[in-house]
Amino acid sequence: MALFPGFFRKGWYMPAGLSAAALFYNPELLLHSVKPQYMLAVSAGSVGFLALALMLFDFRRLAGAVASMKREAQLALGGFFCIAAGHFFLNGRYPFDALGESLVWILLPLAAYVYYDAFRFFLPRALALLGLWDLAVSGIQYHSGAMIFGIAGNTNWNAVLLLVSLPFLAWHLSGLLRRFRFPALASLPAVGAVLGYGLWIFAACASRGAAVALGLTGLIFLAMHLTSRGQRYLRYALLAVLLLGTLYMIGPGSGFARRIAEQEDRLVFYRATLGLIAENPVFGVGGVSFENEFVRFKPEDYFTRMQNAPRTNHPHNDVLFMMASFGILGWLAWAWLVLYPLYGIFRGGAGRLSGERKLLLFAFLCLLFHAQLDLIFVAWPMNLIALWLLGLFWRDAFREEQVSAGLRHPAICRMIACTAGIVILFWTALSVARSAYASSTANAIHDPAMRVSEKLERISRSLRFAPHEYKPNYALMIAAGKLGAPELALAAADALIGSYIENYAHVYGYRGGALVKLGRYDEAFEAYLKEAENYPLSMIPVYNLASISKLTGHPERIPKIEEELFRRMKIQNVTPAQIPLILKNPDYDRAPWDIPVKYGGSGGYPKKR
């Protein structure tokens, strides 16, 4: 402790501990950064609960920081907490870590607010190291001809991660060179080379969302540095560009609006999410229930699009996601917690910001704008970065005069807080252990050297120990079916259906297949009926409904089922001769346009459908 006097006194353990835990989101990243397997261990909710436990252990600091907040901030935090916790207690299917996923939106910013000095020192340096790591991984992937996923696992997410981390890498590299007294003529090209190479990789990611975020953030920074007259001219110029752009889009013969409507999947998500919000306007459906509830609102035309997917866990817009998850009341609280600090910064002007603080603002704005077009606030590590940055901005916006010195904390309060922290820490550790075990099992059973009996035993143990780990359990369900164990596949499917994401991707279809193999045809019929309802243009479940009806002696069902099958085939341009091919290769059920030409298909997505 003498070697690191600030580690406990200044709270450096908080950002250091949370960052260390976050690195184990996918332990494979630490072993095989370029081509990691998916192995979820520490989720954002677990990091949030770890932050809460550590804050409860330091109850004096937590109570003092919360007491020094403005009343409006306390009300917003309390309101959001009550809505998120209310969903947890009212929904009997939510496991403990689901509560962490719902509360992480306020727990991580609160940690950065309470331990402001530690995060203010730690976060810029961590972003610089993260940028160096991601740049190295992205560079290897780029030069090897692979997709530039970086450490984020997606080209769009990787683009914005590079965008927010490269400035910190350049900033601290420049400071490091100055500290070692490198001449400016030598340090400037070195920093420029790193920054230029990073921008080259950023451009190679070809992320439209990141480019839009960069452009909008650049306009805001330009406006902050202009005089009042310059800002007025900038507003006029932007209005002129907006007007001319609108005239171009709606002008005769341009076809721009039509192309956007045909090609932009986000518009389908937005429209469907508005329907979900309209059904649950006040409190939403719950912080982790969006994917399960959104299935009912997916329109048919979505499944005719090239990028249609069996799962949708986010509408690619943070505003709509928060409204759907926590209702309009929850979103109003969240919007105030996000926008009020930014309003204070913009009102103060750029002159009050240091260079490093401008970089922090730049990073947060890029993430905020990109979050309106993608899953930035729920994807690792951008979600953690954005929430910690938000907590730093809370400090200036919400903190009033320090009142903690006059507060008295009875021993019983500190004892209760410590006990709650221990309980939260225990359940968080158990959640992490379950997640890591289920993920490692899902990866291990693909080892060809492992015996089938051993694979089945591991699947069975994992389902018993981690029944709520839906992503690994989905892989285990498919593996059990391929290994000829329908009982185990059915157990995995039932575990998925019993979780808080009942309508997980095609789970009812896999359940129906397992039930057919077990001879339980009536239950299989019900499963395929639910599958056909969840996927309104899928042909396999409807075909299986007809087959079961013939097998069980219910000919009265067949005409209506076949009518529905032919309707779906007509919309998807599928012929009866192609049905056996689709049954053999279910990928063609999702994307029938990929059926090869030699089988009568189009061999690719048509430009005009």
Predicted ranges, named:
Residues 4, 8-24, 42-55, 77-89, ...:
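Alpha-helical transmembrane segments of multi-pass inner-membrane proteins
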Residues 148, 214-218, 236, 244-281, ...:
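Flexible juxtamembrane loops connecting transmembrane helices in multi-pass membrane enzymes
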Residues 234-251, 408-434:
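Internal/C-terminal transmembrane anchor helices
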Residues 276, 287-324:
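Interfacial juxtamembrane loops and adjacent helix segments
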Residues 471-475, 505-510, 539-544, 574-580:
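Alpha-solenoid helical repeat scaffolds
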Residues 530-534, 543-574:
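TPR/TPR-like (Sel1-like) alpha-helical repeat modules
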